[in-house]
Amino acid sequence: ARKRILKELKDKEFFVKKIENALSFREKIFANQENEIDFCRLIHSEGDGLPGLVIDRFKNIFSCQITTAGMEQFKSLIVEALKSVFNNDISIIFRNDLQIRKLEGLELYSENINFDNQNLITLQENGLNFLVDIKNSQKTGWFFDQRKNHYFVRSIANNLKVLDAFSYLGGFGFNALAGNAKEVTFVDISATAIDLISKTADSFYFDKKDKIKIINKKVFDLLEDEEFQKQSFDLVILDPPAFIKSKKDISSILKSYVIGCLLASIYCFTNGVLKYLE
């Protein structure tokens, strides 16, 4: 059985079948949601039978990330399989720059296949548009696993004053606006992320610019700011990055998570909502 599996792995058709199965499954999930299949997590590692491989689909652009030495050796077959399932004109980006690759003895690199120099693309999710820097944004570009959480925020945001902390590209905040939030404050330490939020607001939410505040600052520093503490919010969203990189970090980082939740709770009105995601 082991020899048969190894033989299959050396065959492009093995990867074609896995990708086709994953695509078919997602087509069923998004059957009644226009355009959602064009922007989704196409391959989610072992969940789709391909451990060590993540592929995010941005219409005709496929952002891939390999994290294991075993999967790395099949990179060329992955490219061939994607072209076979879709077409030869697709663009493929390998974002193989995660530090975890070093644990497998792998180099860190990025590679573009049939991709032009235009980094900014328009992503569609839950019927909304977002600008994404496909080559330079975190991980594979977008956190598709938060799709339902983004929509949940929209469903409860009506007439609420919202704080979107660790906002990244604004997935939660712009959904809050789509849900008719009274006001949304975006906060992120990354100047690049803040710039993209601003460009997304200008491009797709110009009619709601008076409801938008954008702050480029470290979230914990802002929450401790005396002037900022004069404000209160109906809904506070905390979606921090993965602070814990290894077991030795657990103790100190857990303190940061607890402090973050306590600080954020100060800003909630009575009967306000604090939504923490990690």
Predicted feature locations:
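A short interface-forming secondary-structure element
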Residues: 59-72
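A short, charged
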Residues: 14-17, 21-33, 87-104, 154-181, ...
